[in-house]
């Protein structure tokens, strides 16, 4: 469902704004520091309950204010509007409303508002540690497997308890009860992740080939422990090692998505522009797979569109996004940088000093 209206209050340098949106492309044009990234950040907050730039609530609430509000309205398939909103206080408390009902959970926001973010720091998906790629996988599994969210949360709680027990246990028998449930959850989580990658990777490899035709892309899922050994057996066999480490070494919390081009890790081959295109391809592939599996459309947030991309690459990305039919929000310093994306269905907003005006 596309956002039809966005209301932001007391968020960073945006005192208040109320804008009507296009179901297609929405362009935010303005100089650095004008507030265009803050609009994307506010939409992200609406879908995730947190900022993508700061984990500290106080930093996104406007100075001398005690709270912020972000509200949105969606048009569903019957063209009825569904309101959603989030209010965050400086003390860290949060209130979520969906359809006018208070007390909703952040996970429900994410279900209603599936978002894909592409921003200048997004290279970490390819160049940093496995946690970024686990988050990438888990975004997809969360939206396609209803049991995943609770199972993953329970596994993390049990893993924390197990790590505490490792410090005091005199024998493995003291952990065996916990390990049975951990193993059951781990096997389920791994199966869901593996299935997701198998289903999504054909789409991802095809789009990557379109963006980077000179390379052959390979995606391979690693589950976090030996693929031929049951997880409970791993836990028992590695008990003494885990004790000496003080934590559980193997498990779904160590899973990774290994990405190579022409058989070599991507970070050793691709330029920054090529890395950005690869990130874009993977994000678009996730959105397309989501639509194929659930009928939901993803909303794309693209910050600093022209960064690292020449005009030819910008056109490739623009054409691919247009083909999805999804709602897209793009920030850019000048209109020239988004010329390939402009059409009659798009909407242009000029942003300056936190004020947002529609053309």
Curated annotation (Swiss-Prot):
GO biological process: DNA replication; DNA synthesis involved in DNA repair; double-strand break repair; SOS response
Signal peptide feature range: none
Location(s), subcellular: Cytoplasm
GO MF term set: ATP binding; single-stranded DNA binding
One Gene Ontology CC term in the entry: cytoplasm
Keywords tagged on the record: ATP-binding, Cytoplasm, DNA damage, DNA repair, DNA replication, DNA-binding, Nucleotide-binding, SOS response
InterPro entries: DNA-binding_RecF, DNA-binding_RecF_CS, P-loop_NTPase, RecF/RecN/SMC_N, RecF_2
Binding site for ATP: 30-37
One matching Pfam family: SMC_N
Function: The RecF protein is involved in DNA metabolism; it is required for DNA replication and normal SOS inducibility. RecF binds preferentially to single-stranded, linear DNA. It also seems to bind ATP.
Family: Belongs to the RecF family.
HAMAP family, per the entry: RecF
UniProt name for this protein: DNA replication and repair protein RecF
Source organism of this protein record: Vibrio parahaemolyticus serotype O3:K6 (strain RIMD 2210633)
């Amino acid at each position: 469902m596309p956002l039809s209206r966005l209301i932001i209050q007391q968020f960073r340098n945006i005192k208040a704004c109320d804008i009507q949106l296009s179901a297609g492309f929405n362009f935010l044009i303005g100089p650095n520091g004008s507030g265009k990234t803050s609009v994307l950040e506010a939409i992200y907050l609406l879908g995730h309950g947190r900022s993508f730039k700061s984990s500290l609530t106080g930093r996104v609430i406007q100075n001398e204010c005690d709270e912020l509000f972000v509200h949105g309205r969606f048009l569903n398939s019957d063209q009825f509007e569904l309101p959603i909103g989030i209010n965050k206080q400086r003390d860290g408390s949060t209130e979520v409303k969906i359809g006018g009902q208070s007390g909703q959970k952040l996970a429900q926001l994410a279900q209603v508002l599936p978002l894909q973010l592409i921003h200048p720091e997004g290279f970490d998906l390819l160049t940093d540690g496995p946690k970024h790629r686990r988050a990438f996988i888990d975004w997809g599994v969360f939206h396609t497997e209803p049991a995943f969210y609770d199972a993953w949360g329970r596994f993390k709680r049990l893993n924390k308890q197990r790590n505490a027990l490792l410090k005091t246990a005199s024998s493995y028998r003291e952990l065996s009860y916990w390990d049975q449930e951990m193993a059951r959850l781990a096997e389920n989580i791994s199966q869901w992740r593996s299935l997701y990658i198998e289903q999504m990777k054909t789409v991802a490899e095809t789009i990557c080939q379109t963006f980077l035709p000179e390379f052959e892309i390979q995606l391979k899922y690693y589950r976090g422990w030996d693929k031929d050994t049951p997880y409970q057996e791993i836990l028992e066999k590695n008990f003494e090692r885990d004790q000496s480490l003080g934590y559980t070494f193997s498990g779904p919390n160590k899973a990774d998505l290994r990405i190579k081009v022409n058989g070599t890790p991507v970070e050793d081959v691709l330029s920054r522009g090529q890395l950005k295109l690869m990130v874009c391809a993977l994000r678009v592939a996730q959105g397309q797979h989501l639509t194929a599996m659930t009928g939901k459309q993803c909303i794309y947030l693209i910050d600093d569109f022209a960064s690292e991309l020449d005009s030819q690459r910008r056109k490739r990305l623009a054409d691919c996004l247009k083909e999805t039919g999804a709602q897209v929000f793009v920030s850019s310093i000048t209109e020239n940088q988004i010329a390939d994306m402009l059409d009659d269905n798009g909407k242009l907003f000029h942003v300056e000093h936190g004020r947002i005006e529609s053309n």
